[in-house]
């Protein structure tokens, strides 16, 4: 029985070599496609201030915040809820913002693709 399980695991298709980078690329392509820039405007109108406030709060509450640049990628579902929210590089500031961002609801995205990919590059300047 154990050997069957091992064989099944070995023959299962693996994850892509770099799923994060693939998701970022898909999000960038989606943003550049028809309807992408309009959705970006709606999204930032809804969460721009909230994102800034969350980022400032994360920095203020961490003992030695690592302000290195990072990228956040997420899937927006039809109802605006978020899934698969990930960051790279996973600094303390990035993971703090990731945890806050994951609970937010964004405007309903275009119907296609579903789920709708987004990516945000963060660069914190003094």
Where do the language-model regions lie?
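Charge-biased low-complexity segments
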Residues: 12-126
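Sec-dependent N-terminal signal peptides
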Residues: 2-11
């Amino acid at each position: 029985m154990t050997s069957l399980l091992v064989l099944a695991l070995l023959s299962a298709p693996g994850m892509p070599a770099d799923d994060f980078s693939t998701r970022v690329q898909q999000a960038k392509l989606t943003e550049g496609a028809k309807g992408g820039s309009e959705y970006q405007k709606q999204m930032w109108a809804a969460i721009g201030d909230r994102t800034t406030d969350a980022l400032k709060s994360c920095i203020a509450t961490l003992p030695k915040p690592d302000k290195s640049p990072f990228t956040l990628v997420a899937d927006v579902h039809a109802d605006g809820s978020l899934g698969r929210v990930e960051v790279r590089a996973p600094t303390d500031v990035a993971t703090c913002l990731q945890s806050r961002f994951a609970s937010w609801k964004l405007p309903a995205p275009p119907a296609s693709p579903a789920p709708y990919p987004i990516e945000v590059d963060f660069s914190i300047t003094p």
